[in-house]
């Protein structure tokens, strides 16, 4: 479709105004029916026909030229469609071409005249016009304030014919210390706040220029350093740029959205910026890494902590990058007795609304999305920011803080898009390119300033030389002037007689009589010497690029020394700021219960209250038919749980990913968490907090094979699992424990035989090996349990003195805690068992009845009370899922041949399936108090 436009070369005054008329009827233009979209467009952009209030003879007569068949309609003006030169005023053009050209023209107008800053002075046109208008009004940093309305009116009337709100908003932003790293305007009155409070009306607020602005942007404005262009009505001129001495674009940053393009440049520290500029001056081939040594990253006016340097490197290298900013916080202890703490927010990320942040946190707490917070209040005042978030008793401040980072704007990202206007075109630039572009501009400014000063000095020197000639020939000059009948003849006579120029002659005529003394002559002579010296220096400066760069550096350092202030944003290189699930999940203690059928569930430790020895216990939950509890252990949420199967394969999963269930729930099938094969059962679980290099896993099979593997081999496990041990036929992996070379291993068979051996005696092997024989088993006997004796208790193993039975109860730990399948148990001092090598029968540790056998053995006595007794607790689980939690100190200390005491009355609960220990530090004191009352 073609669009009719007027020929721009033909003035509109050369022809009468044209009246638009569609002239379209269905009968005359049937071809338009095929292009309904074009018809709709034409009808939408063409005004409806109106009656012309003039004589018929003066009305326009139109005729149809034709329809080109593609929907293009050509209308010509009969008789009056030609200009005086005979040229037609109707221009035929394609609609898509005209739309493209018009849109590009509009886009470039927005880019260059409104939205994007210039790389050279770092200002958008509106900011540049505001500063220049204030400079013209004489609002220097040492002059009194003037109303902002006066400044806005000056800008609107002379330079920026747009809305007053846009101009005032731009002025306000340049005065806000939380918006600009180095404010360019000093405001007096209400200029808004970090809570997004609006500023007062312009008739109430006052402003003036900052001293930094005068020194950095306006110092050389009157010395022909930049070009001046006509303003919008050609009534006066305005600067196209300001002669910046420091890269203001990097100092205060910029943000703006144009047509199809945007910019977002972070602010930086003045001192670091000048140092980086100096480094580039001394070494134009400096790499980005070398520049980063002087300017390591952005410096935001609101402070905060910049997380990681990868985004900074990418932004400085390519112009695009993502900088993660966190608010600066501190943890305060509110009550030392209850250990209640509070998170104090002292700084927030750049461009974050403080009031909205507080409101968001309150909403999260109210909706129970953010847990552990009891109160929040804003205590900010003139002295600084202080947001207090009080935590509930027992809440982990680190977890609450990580949740704040993830759920609120306390951690936000600044997306760098360093686009600026360079040579009249928008361009994406990195750090070095921005600095180099500024240096090129600054060199031009210094050269133009030097040429301006040189021209003035030469002109003045020329005048001074003429005056000195006149003073040297004073009598002749006076006679010549007295003889002349007019000023013009006097000037002409002086030029002719003394070979002076017109300006020199005029200067002599303008001298007053008081300046004809000898003293004044000496002053002119000294001035001439000074001018010649200045001219020589300026000529030398203009002939040396090195001196120009040196002067640029000196002027930048002068501004740095005068206006520098310390960095506000801290840099944290070790943390990228990316939060994972583990960062927002409390590292609380939890209980894991696994059944033989492969069901697992996670419960809180207080699910089972402490009970007395010999009680029935509490059910751990409903079990499937023919299912029984397999393992029951204590771990923490952040632990990495290693699952070892009966086939010698190991799997891995974070503890917090196991669904939390109630005590009566059946649990989650392990096949939903792990990639188990058909018929594969999990027989042992090891929670690992850290994969230390000096730690090993000791593996023991049912048939008595043992081996030791470095824990590091299991740090990375694929989802399908890896081999942990090679098994012989009819054997299965049953027990896995974590140990070091200085520890000891205690193994026991179902018949009660016990072997103690140093871990160092066990060879360290790879994963895909079988191991060696752990102990000699009699016919029908099998390994029943295994535990580790830490090196800290080694001294107790050296006790080999025979102690009588009456002394056992008063003997301190450590002890071996034996638990039989029928619910009996006892403690035997470790000192009653001597160490032996592998592949031995061992010593008697338990005397069983004919229908009973050993279920588990533990080393207890790690934590002792003031009375020398154990503070640990043991959790017993029966085959039917009943759980009993009792104190270890309530279990009797007996000889190796004793049967023990009743720990749990099983009745119809079957046999003891598994047992686990809970340390004293992990026990809940409220449970202990409840048990004491019940007893």
From Swiss-Prot:
Compositional bias ranges of the Polar residues kind: 1-28
One Gene Ontology biological process: DNA topological change
Motif GyrA-box in this chain: 611-617
Molecular function via GO: ATP binding; DNA binding; DNA topoisomerase type II (double strand cut, ATP-hydrolyzing) activity
Tissue: Ubiquitous.
Keyword annotations: ATP-binding, Chloroplast, DNA-binding, Isomerase, Mitochondrion, Nucleotide-binding, Plastid, Topoisomerase, Transit peptide
Keyword check for Cytoplasm: no
InterPro entries: GyrA, GyrA/parC_rep, Gyrase/topoIV_suA_C, Topo_IIA-like_dom_sf, Topo_IIA_A/C_ab, Topo_IIA_A_a_sf, Topo_IIA_dom_A, Type_II_DNA_Topoisomerases
GO cellular component, one term: DNA topoisomerase type II (double strand cut, ATP-hydrolyzing) complex
Name of one Pfam family that matches: DNA_gyraseA_C
Entry annotated with the keyword Nucleotidyltransferase: no
Enzyme class: isomerase
Name by which UniProt lists this protein: DNA gyrase subunit A, chloroplastic/mitochondrial
UniProt organism field: Nicotiana benthamiana
Record gene name: GYRA
């Amino acid at each position: 479709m073609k669009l009719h436009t007027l020929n721009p070369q033909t003035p509109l005054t050369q022809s009468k105004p044209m009246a638009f008329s569609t002239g379209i009827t269905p009968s005359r233009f049937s071809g338009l029916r095929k292009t309904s979209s074009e018809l709709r467009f034409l009808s939408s952009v063409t005004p409806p026909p109106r009656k012309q209030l003039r004589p018929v003879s003066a009305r326009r007569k139109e005729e149809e030229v034709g329809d080109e068949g593609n929907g293009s309609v050509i209308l010509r003006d009969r008789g009056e469609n030609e200009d005086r030169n005979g040229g037609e005023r109707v221009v035929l053009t394609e609609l898509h071409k005209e739309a493209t050209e018009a849109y590009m023209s509009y886009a470039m107008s927005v880019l260059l005249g409104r939205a994007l800053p210039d790389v050279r002075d770092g200002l958008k046109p509106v900011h540049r016009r505001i500063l220049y208008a204030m400079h013209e009004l004489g609002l220097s940093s040492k002059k009194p304030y003037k109303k902002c309305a006066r400044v806005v009116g000056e800008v609107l009337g002379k330079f920026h014919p747009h809305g007053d709100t846009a101009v005032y908003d731009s002025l306000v932003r340049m005065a806000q210390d939380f918006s600009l790293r180095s404010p360019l305007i000093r405001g007096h009155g209400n200029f808004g706040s970090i809570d997004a409070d609006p500023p007062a009306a312009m008739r109430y607020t006052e402003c003036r220029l900052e001293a930094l602005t005068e020194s950095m942007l306006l110092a050389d404005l009157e010395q022909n350093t930049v070009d001046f262009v006509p303003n919008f009505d050609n009534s006066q001129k305005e600067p196209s740029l300001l002669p910046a001495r420091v890269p203001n674009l990097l100092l205060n940053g910029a943000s703006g959205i144009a047509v199809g393009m945007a910019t977002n440049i972070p602010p930086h520290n003045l001192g670091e910026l000048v140092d980086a500029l100096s480094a580039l001056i001394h070494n134009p081939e400096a790499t980005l890494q070398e520049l980063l040594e002087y300017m390591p990253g952005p410096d935001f006016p609101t402070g905060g902590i910049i997380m990681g340097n990868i985004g900074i490197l990418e932004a400085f290298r390519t112009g695009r990058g993502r900088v993660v900013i966190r608010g600066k916080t501190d943890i305060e202890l509110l009550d030392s007795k209850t250990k209640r703490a509070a998170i104090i927010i002292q700084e927030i990320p750049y461009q974050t609304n403080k009031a909205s942040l507080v409101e968001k946190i309150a909403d999260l707490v109210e909706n129970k999305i953010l847990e552990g917070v009891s109160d929040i209040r804003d205590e900010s005042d003139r002295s600084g920011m202080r947001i207090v978030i009080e935590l509930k008793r027992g809440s982990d401040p680190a977890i609450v803080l990580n949740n704040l980072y993830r759920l609120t704007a306390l951690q936000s990202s600044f997306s760098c898009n360093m686009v600026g206007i360079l040579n009249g075109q928008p361009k994406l630039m990195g750090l070095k390119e921005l600095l180099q572009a500024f240096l090129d501009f600054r060199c031009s400014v210094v050269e133009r300033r030097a040429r301006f000063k040189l021209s003035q000095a030469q002109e003045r020197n020329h005048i001074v030389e003429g005056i000195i000639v006149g003073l040297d020939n004073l009598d002749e000059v006076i006679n010549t002037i007295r003889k002349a009948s007019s000023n013009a003849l006097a000037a002409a006579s002086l030029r002719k007689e003394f070979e002076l120029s017109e300006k020199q002659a005029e200067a002599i005529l303008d001298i007053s009589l008081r300046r004809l003394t000898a003293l004044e002559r000496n002053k002119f002579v000294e001035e001439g010497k000074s001018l010649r010296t200045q001219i020589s220096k300026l000529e030398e400066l203009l002939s040396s690029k090195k001196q120009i760069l040196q002067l640029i550096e000196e002027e930048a350092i002068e501004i740095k020394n005068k206006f520098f202030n310390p960095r506000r944003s801290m840099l944290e290189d070790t943390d990228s700021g990316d939060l994972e699930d583990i960062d927002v999940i409390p590292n609380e203690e939890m209980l894991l219960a696994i059944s033989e059928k492969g069901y697992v569930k996670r419960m809180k430790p207080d699910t089972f209250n402490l009970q007395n020895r010999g009680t029935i216990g509490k059910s751990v939950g409903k079990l499937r038919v023919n299912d029984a509890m397999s393992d029951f252990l204590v771990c923490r949420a952040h632990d990495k749980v290693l699952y070892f199967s009966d086939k010698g394969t190991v799997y891995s999963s974070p503890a917090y990913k196991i669904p939390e269930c109630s005590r009566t729930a059946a649990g989650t099938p392990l096949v939903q968490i792990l990639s188990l094969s058909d018929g594969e059962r999990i027989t042992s679980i090891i929670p690992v907090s850290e994969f230390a290099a000096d730690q090993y896993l000791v593996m023991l099979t049912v048939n008595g094979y043992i081996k030791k593997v470095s824990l590091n081999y299991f740090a990375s496990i694929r989802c399908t699992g890896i081999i942990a041990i090679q098994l012989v036929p009819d054997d299965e992996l049953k027990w896995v424990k974590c140990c070091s070379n200085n520890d000891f291993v205690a193994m026991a068979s179902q018949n009660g035989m016990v072997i103690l051996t140093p871990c160092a005696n066990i060879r360290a092997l790879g994963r895909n090996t079988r191991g060696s024989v752990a102990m000699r088993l009699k016919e029908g006997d099998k390994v029943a349990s295994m535990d580790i004796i830490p090196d800290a208790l080694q001294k107790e193993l050296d006790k080999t003195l025979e102690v009588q039975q009456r002394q056992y109860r008063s003997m301190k730990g450590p002890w071996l805690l034996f638990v039989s399948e029928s619910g009996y148990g006892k403690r035997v001092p470790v000192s009653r068992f001597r160490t032996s090598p592998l592949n031995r029968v061992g010593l008697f540790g338990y005397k069983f009845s004919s229908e009973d056998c050993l279920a588990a053995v533990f080393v207890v006595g790690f934590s002792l009370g003031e009375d020398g007794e154990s503070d640990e607790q043991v959790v017993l689980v029966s085959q039917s899922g009943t759980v009993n939690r009792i104190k270890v100190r309530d279990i009797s200390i007996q000889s190796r041949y004793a049967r023990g005491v009743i720990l749990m009355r099983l009745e119809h609960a079957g046999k003891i399936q598994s047992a686990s220990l809970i340390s004293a530090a992990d026990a809940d004191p409220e449970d202990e108090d409840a048990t004491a009352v019940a007893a």
